[in-house]
Amino acid sequence: MLKREMNIADYDAELWQAMEQEKVRQEEHIELIASENYTSPRVMQAQGSQLTNKYAEGYPGKRYYGGCEYVDIVEQLAIDRAKELFGADYANVQPHSGSQANFAVYTALLEPGDTVLGMNLAHGGHLTHGSPVNFSGKLYNIVPYGIDATGHIDYADLEKQAKEHKPKMIIGGFSAYSGVVDWAKMREIADSIGAYLFVDMAHVAGLVAAGVYPNPVPHAHVVTTTTHKTLAGPRGGLILAKGGSEELYKKLNSAVFPGGQGGPLMHVIAGKAVALKEAMEPEFKTYQQQVAKNAKAMVEVFLERGYKVVSGGTDNHLFLVDLVDKNLTGKEADAALGRANITVNKNSVPNDPKSPFVTSGIRVGTPAITRRGFKEVEAKELAGWMCDVLDSINDEAVIERIKGKVLDICARYPVYA
């Protein structure tokens, strides 16, 4: 018999200490990594539930194991909410991650060796959009497209590449692009050569759900997303589609299970269901609107302080600061800001002279600070502190002074009150 009072603290002090230290780190550091966010206690309650015990290979009503009558309800709730939230008529909530959702789409729509047009990783794309170190770059013939001199997607070049290489699939979506993507234009290009349009909206799904960023679901053949990032749910993936055939939906389901995964994580799917319900609340829209406002406010300060922002601004939750002219590397900036309890990630910028392990830029995102309650005033103040650190990157006294300010604002705006 298992006693409910069993706990980690009394049993595994070494593990518990690391967990507690991470809790303190999250409370005492300002999180600006664009792909990170804070999930609600309700989501964590679902993830720590007895649903973690249940194997449920298959789909609701079509399981390979008995005893699935209640987890069927859980998964169907998640499916129905995903469809309602994004205006889809198909949803698969089983992918363990965004990358596995993307793997399923490749598996369902393509054969190894097929040509795919994807955004260049160095211009803001993602590993799964064709990087040579990823399955996508190893199994498929990848043709990259990118951004123009203004820092925006070069649709003329994209169309030219599409007509020249005749890819079977075009990928829209990004991990470090601050503009608005013209999904309709991408579909028009895809249709002109008979290609699939697959959109990975992982970074902007929360903004899309709130109507703050254009919804790709009506335009793409298939859409994937993560359920964390701006959506603020548990770490996981999701596949969506609208207006497709039953044959396509069967292929997608089969590509997830049994094609790429075994049993789904029912405790995580419950967390997804909760997060999707939270995303339907009016306050979620207010939150996403503030995420975008905070990003614009921070960009304003960086520009005023003489820093270059890729594409000159932002229309979503993130932006890239190009440090080439400052003779700084992303690695140096990341480390110095980290010592001030400000967490960012080093990031390549277009035409970056440095390697991906060093880089010449940093990526900044506002979902997590907005979750804490930051508004434009706090966002601008924070951007100013970051510039102070970057202006005096080797001055530990400046870094310590900013760290004190960070600890103070973190105490005033706790993650979990």
UniProtKB/Swiss-Prot annotation:
What are the names of the required cofactors?
Answer: pyridoxal 5'-phosphate
> Where, by residue number, does (6S)-5,6,7,8-tetrahydrofolate bind?
L121, G125, H126, L127, S355, P356, F357
Would you kindly state one Gene Ontology biological process term found in this protein's UniProt entry? tetrahydrofolate interconversion
Under the heading Pfam families, the entry gives:
SHMT
E.C. code: 2.1.2.1
List residues, modification N6-(pyridoxal phosphate)lysine: K229
Annotated positions for site Plays an important role in substrate specificity: H228
What cellular-component terms does GO give this entry? cytosol
In the UniProt record, does the keyword Acetylation occur?
A: yes
Gene Ontology terms, MF aspect: glycine hydroxymethyltransferase activity; pyridoxal phosphate binding
Q: In which pathway does it act?
A: One-carbon metabolism; tetrahydrofolate interconversion; Amino-acid biosynthesis; glycine biosynthesis; glycine from L-serine: step 1/1
UniProt family annotation: Belongs to the SHMT family.
How is this protein organized at the quaternary level?
A: Homodimer.
What HAMAP family is this protein classified in? SHMT
- Please report the name of this protein according to its UniProt entry: Serine hydroxymethyltransferase
Organism annotation? Escherichia coli O157:H7
